């Protein structure tokens, strides 16, 4: 049983690449043709590549490793958060803060601060403080929650990154590469596939395309976790 069908990919518009004047020649092997100045991605290749990525993520999750979902562009934010939460993984969907991987200890301290503020809110210790101070602390908490909420429970570096648009998320990609963390990514016709370990050639701009492929990776995590439980 194929992980994904041509029909699903077509219906979600995964085959539409970027304009022909905005392309990376390294993506040539994944391009089927061009139509009205737009590259059309070879979906037969995408089907194969989705399967490879799916099996890799599934195996990773079965070994108890984690996946960090990264997509900060408008079209990706919602799918990234919802699908990562659905499979119990971590996500960054607002802004990649430099050092999120390479300076993880410092980021962890910011997360500890977020958790400290949450505790203060829960146990009522804010109630004794002046209103102005409470407002400042709440503002700090909201800001930390916005940028770090998706990695709050991440105690160590992830086993892999799943990235939507490695060109937009180039800082995340560079950090993962520096640390030898494998990268799975939706790679459009204007991206460099050499930066990515598991390339999924596809449209990274259409909400439906992003949602479909992100959901598939979340499914892989869930299937892998099931395997991990069975192994126990």
Curated annotation (Swiss-Prot):
Similarity field: Belongs to the universal ribosomal protein uS2 family.
SUPFAM superfamilies: Ribosomal protein S2
InterPro entries linked: Ribosomal_uS2, Ribosomal_uS2_bac/mit/plastid, Ribosomal_uS2_CS, Ribosomal_uS2_flav_dom_sf
A matching Pfam family: Ribosomal_S2
GO molecular function, a single term: structural constituent of ribosome
Residue stretches spanning the membrane: none
Organism of this sequence: Pelotomaculum thermopropionicum (strain DSM 13744 / JCM 10971 / SI)
PROSITE patterns to which the protein is assigned, alphabetical: RIBOSOMAL_S2_1, RIBOSOMAL_S2_2
Organism taxonomic ancestry: Bacteria, Bacillati, Bacillota, Clostridia, Eubacteriales
Source organism superkingdom: Bacteria
GO biological process: translation
Keyword list, A-Z: Ribonucleoprotein, Ribosomal protein
Protein's UniProt name: Small ribosomal subunit protein uS2
GO CC, any one term: cytosolic small ribosomal subunit
